[in-house]
Amino acid sequence: MVDTAPYIGSLGRSSLFDTGDIEQAPGNNAIGINEEDIHAFVSSTGETVQLKKKPAKLATGNISLYTNPDTVWRSDDTYGININYLLDKIEASGDDRTNAQKTSPITGKIGSDTLWVEKWRPKKFLDLVGNEKTNRRMLGWLRQWTPAVFKEQLPKLPTEKEVSDMELDPLKRPPKKILLLHGPPGIGKTSVAHVIAKQSGFSVSEINASDERAGPMVKEKIYNLLFNHTFDTNPVCLVADEIDGSIESGFIRILVDIMQSDIKATNKLLYGQPDKKDKKRKKKRSKLLTRPIICICNNLYAPSLEKLKPFCEIIAVKRPSDTTLLERLNLICHKENMNIPIKAINDLIDLAQGDVRNCINNLQFLASNVDSRDSSASDKPACAKNTWASSNKDSPISWFKIVNQLFRKDPHRDIKEQFYELLNQVELNGNSDRILQGCFNIFPYVKYSDNGIRKPANISDWLFFHDLMYQSMYAHNGELLRYSALVPLVFFQTFGDIANKDDIRMKNSEYEQRELKRANSDIVSLIMRHISVQSPLMASFTDRKSLIFEILPYLDSMISSDFNKIRNLKLKQAIMEELVQLLKSFQLNLIQNRSEGFDVRGGLTIDPPIDEVVLLNPKHINEVQHKRANNLSSLLAKIEENRAKKRHIDQVTEDRLQSQEMHSKKVKTGLNSSSSTIDFFKNQYGLLKQTQELEETQKTIGSDETNQADDCNQTVKIWVKYNEGFSNAVRKNVTWNNLWE
């Protein structure tokens, strides 16, 4: 049994350590093992087994498991191994693998059934595709939670300004406690949120807000995630997806309550101790929010988000550029051993309209298609195997390929044959609308012969014919819709030419226009709701069409007018007062725009952004935004001035009511002493003085600062003469009111 048992030193041996100079270990007598250190026992088979005590010097790790039992390492720098020989052997094995990869054909076979969307999901910040500035801004917002969550101090930025202690958060959290990401679906908003949260050291807990509709259950779930300790070692970051699909009284109401409770707790921590009542009622005590919340939505101007947006840091996520998406898809093809041409990848990007998940799914489908075709074509010649053209020979032609074929004529084929072939492809494709839109977008850039503009004038009539046929879908059950397939063939007859040999990669503007139209429609709907709440009478005479074409353009023009050059102060103040009232009527707010960068203080913008609905020319947009910056700053100063005046008037009114209340209480007590009489006249003097201050403040609203200073300097004095004494000459019942008649 002892002879056949393998020695433990032979386990896990590597071929790399089989060479080199090895010294033999000395025997038992040489290393000085005594007979007392040898112990014997009888095994279950009756054999006697001797165990030798391990020497103390061998317990220091000089014997390796990769060596024989009778060998030890050398004590010199080489450790008994020829390092140069090992390096040469590793380089030779690496060259063999490289040559094998070069000589082996690219088959494009898939080794597992894993979805590529999950396989190539970004794991870290550097794996994200596009939107580098936006991603850094989101990472910077999460980084601001480090002092409150991880108890670490952030390094000061060189551009950071000194702020007073009263303006800082006591826990050094960001000003906005919720990060709101919005953008079109399919561009990776949720993936970005997960990656930046994990990159910052948080464990992600995701909730789909549109599915969570039960109020008490959702509230308990959110409170457990944000305020209770979890089994995970990392702090939790709450990610709420599809928040625009939730009802206002459900998920969003809970978030608003959390933010209001956090504001109360922060104010108590800054300005005073909590009340004794709050100590007794611990369940209703305000709680500080110490965990970040990331919300994701598609529609920023949804009605349910109006109450939540003031607490949010809003970041727009845009679709990645075609160049960055092409680089990522090309990398995936290289890693998956797929030989797909760049032109085919560009077609995938156009077909998916910038949707990263859609591109990767289509790429995996094409790879599996190549794999199945290669396996079924094993009996074909080698020249017909493993080519992109042969694998996609029987696949349907995409609509943008048909668009390019419509502008290309083959001089070696009959025109009639080409016409019927293209007609068959258009009818079988099922995307006649996209084909026609692509023809309309591409025909100004193709080569064709024309004297004047006769051909474009002719095609405009056929486009009108297509609109009439398309309307039959709603009027005649689509009976005339089949004639719309002839309109793309008119482009073939009119603009087809043999000089159009290269494909024109069109910019598919349909998706962008649809998203822009949806965003502008949401902005107009939000303004209509504001008008109905603020001015119901005005809302009854205002519709969406008049608001877009008649009201908003003139309102934007008035705000953009350069009234800072007016030297007449009264006229300037009057204009600013009217503009402030207009902003108040439409509930347009002036907010700070920080879209250029997270640490860069941007200019003021109007929320909701009416300039996106009104301004269409990009050059005019830049000019108006540059001119409007000073105007918005002046309007914001005027709004703050009106708020300060209103607070002063409210304070004076409150003091007047308090003094009147005190006066009425003293009248009821019936104090008739001389001291009380004197105090009464003093109180009346103070009351009259406060009344005059209130009247002066109301008169100075809307006037110049100079006139306001002159009015404030005017004072009114009251002289009261009182002769104390008693006389019986005239006796008459005198009431208290008679004294003041």
Swiss-Prot record:
Binding annotation for ATP: G183, P184, P185, G186, I187, G188, K189, T190
Pfam family, one: AAA_lid_RFC1
Keywords associated with the record: ATP-binding, Cell cycle, DNA replication, DNA-binding, Nucleotide-binding, Nucleus
InterPro entries for the chain: AAA+_ATPase, ATPase_AAA_core, P-loop_NTPase, RFC_lid
Keyword Lyase among UniProt keywords: no
Sequence similarity: Belongs to the activator 1 small subunits family. CTF18 subfamily.
The protein's name in its UniProt record: Chromosome transmission fidelity protein 18
Organism of this sequence: Saccharomyces cerevisiae (strain ATCC 204508 / S288c) (Baker's yeast)
